[in-house]
Amino acid sequence: MPTLHIKSEKNAFSNIVLMPGDPVRAKYIAENYLANPVQINDTRLMLAYTGYYKNKKISVMSHGMGIPSASLYVRELILEYNVKKIIRVGTCGTIQNNIKLRDIVISMGASTDSKINRIRFNNHDYAAIADFEMIFHAFSTAKKMNFKVHIGNFFTTDSFYTESEDMLKILKKYNIIGIDMETAGIYAVAAELKAQALSICTVSDHIIKKDAVSSKDRESSFHNMITLSLETTLLL
């Protein structure tokens, strides 16, 4: 049944949903990678589509920016639409010298400066981790397709424009491979509701080198990430 934020019919979604942050990217994925895509939501302009990838039913829906927005949509998808598996397909920054622009990074866990997981976890630190089965299949698929991927810990931040030099040094020291604004929240909601989640991202910004993929080049740069994510769904 429709929720406060998703006005789709009960069986409109697949049990596997790819979730970019940007609704325009959700539309792009549906129109360029799925067969027979049907738009199933446009409430608050959070576009959602269901179609088929190699005869497997797949949905794609945007989750917006930040943990609160992403957590809200993930929760409603799992509780009201029986979604079992979430793959975040998005962008992230990096600070590691061995990781380059357009590289694919997979988050096996995510630390955060947000308080939301502490609120959920009775003011204790929660280890927000990806589902192992999904990591395994994504890594195996990447090897089979000869895609170079980096797997490690993310840092999910509430503050997009705050770049403390001291904090960046700490993140680099602890081998954080990706910085985003959603993964820690998505992993916590999925764990709480007994679902599976994984973030597969493309590096769009190297924060220390101050280098970035241009807005014009972003869609074409993310082909491998989207293909890897879709091929992974075939094993789930």
From Swiss-Prot:
GO biological process assignments: purine nucleoside catabolic process
Active site, renumbered: D205 (proton donor)
Keyword terms: Glycosyltransferase, Transferase
Molecular-function annotations in GO: purine-nucleoside phosphorylase activity
Catalytic activity, as annotated: a purine D-ribonucleoside + phosphate = a purine nucleobase + alpha-D-ribose 1-phosphate; a purine 2'-deoxy-D-ribonucleoside + phosphate = a purine nucleobase + 2-deoxy-alpha-D-ribose 1-phosphate
InterPro entries: DeoD-type, Nucleoside_phosphorylase_CS, Nucleoside_phosphorylase_d, Nucleoside_phosphorylase_sf
Keyword Glycosyltransferase among record annotations: yes
A GO cellular component annotation in the UniProt record: cytosol
Site (Important for catalytic activity): R218
The EC number(s) this enzyme carries: 2.4.2.1
Pfam families: PNP_UDP_1
Paired cysteines (S-S): none
Residues at which a purine D-ribonucleoside binds: H5, D180, M181, E182, S204, D205
Organism domain of life: Bacteria
EC top class named in words: transferase
Binding annotation for phosphate: G21, R25, R44, R88, V89, G90, T91
Quaternary data: Homohexamer; trimer of homodimers.
Known role: Catalyzes the reversible phosphorolytic breakdown of the N-glycosidic bond in the beta-(deoxy)ribonucleoside molecules, with the formation of the corresponding free purine bases and pentose-1-phosphate.
Family listed: Belongs to the PNP/UDP phosphorylase family.
Protein name: Purine nucleoside phosphorylase DeoD-type
Species this protein is from: Buchnera aphidicola subsp. Schizaphis graminum (strain Sg)
Gene giving rise to this polypeptide: deoD
